[in-house]
Amino acid sequence: MKKTIRILLSLACVAALVLSLGVGALAKSDIDLEEVAAMAQKACDQQEIQNIMSWHVMYHCYGLHREEMEEIWVNEPENRATASFGQNQGFYVGYDSIWEAYVEGHDTSWLATAKNYCAQSDIDIEGWTDEEILEVYGGVGQLLLHVTTTAIIEVAEDGQTAKCFWYSPGMIAESGQTGNTIWEAYGVDFVKEDGEWKMWHLHMFTDFMGGFYLTLGGKTSGGMGGPGGGGGASGEASGDSSEQQEWKGEGGAQASSKHDYLYSPQYKEFSHDRLRSDMEIFLPKAYDEWSFDDGNYGPTREEYESFGIDLDAWYDAH
C-alpha cells in the first residue's frame, strides 16, 4: 500500500511537471526525462518526510510515544545504534536510551499526572492498577502540542538521507499548573530504510518559554516537555524567576546508568539578555555529505551526495 502511494505521488509530481513545462517542451531532445523523474522523486521524498514529522507531532500530542518509536523511528541495527534525541542540556544516544526516556519515562510522567488529576477531581481510583489508570486517565488534563512551521527539507542526491529544519511555537499545560508557551528549533535527520523514510536524529532546542498569562519577565511553572514525556509534569513549580530556574529535560527525565547520555553544558539558565540558547543555529541547505562537524544540527551549503561519516569515530571524539 505504501509503495503504491509513493508511486502515485511520483506520478502526480511528474504530471505537475508536464503541465508546467508543456507537452511540447517534453518532446524536445533537450529535456532529460531522467532528470524530470529525479525531480519528481525528490518532491515525493520531501512530502513523505513532512508527513512523518507531522506524525511525530501528533503521536507526541496524544502521548503515543511507544507507537511513534515503533512506526516512524529507525529499524536497522546500525541506525538504531546511532539514533539520537537531543535537547539544550544534552543528547540521548541509541534507540534503547531514547526508548527508556521517551517511552518508559513518559509512561511514568503520565501516570503521575493522571493520579494528580484524579486527586484534584475527587475521582476514586483506589484499587486500580497503574495500567488501568493510564488506560482511562492517561493524558487527561495535559496538553503537549509542538506545532511545526517553516519546513526546510534537503534530500541528499543519493536519496538515502535528508536534513531538515522546522521552527515550533508550542503549548504545554498540565492540570493544576500554569500553562506555558514554548518556542523551539527542530533539527531532524531522516534516513531511508527499505524504501521508507525513518526518523534518525531528532534535536529540539528551546529558545524561550513563558506562561500563558504572564509576560517573559514573570515566572514560569514546571519544566519543558520532551523525552521524559510530560510537558512540565515533572518540572517543579517554582517561585523563582525564570532567570534563576535551571532547565531540565522534558518531563525532568534522568538518564539511566545503562545508557550513554552526552551532556552539553551550553544552556544551564534562562537569560533575558539572550533569548536564544547558546547553540548556534545552522539551517539545512544543499550539502555534500552528512557531517556532525557543522553544529549539533544542520549542514553547511554544499552539494550533498551521500551520508559518508564514521559515526562510531565521531561519538568517540565527542
Where are these regions (language model features)?
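Bacterial N-terminal signal peptides that target proteins for export
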Residues: 1-12
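Intrinsically disordered, low-complexity Ser/Thr/Pro-rich tracts
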Residues: 5, 19-31
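Bacterial N-terminal signal peptides
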Residues: 11-20
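Short, low-complexity N-terminal intrinsically disordered segments enriched in polar/charged residues
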Residues: 26-67, 71-75, 227
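A solvent-exposed, acidic/Ser-Thr-rich amphipathic alpha-helical stretch
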Residues: 66-167
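Short beta-strand edge/turn micro-motifs at domain boundaries
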Residues: 161-165, 183-216
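Ser/Thr/Gly/Pro-rich low-complexity, disordered linker/stalk segments of secreted
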Residues: 224-242
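Intrinsic low-complexity, glycine/proline- and repeat-rich
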Residues: 251-318
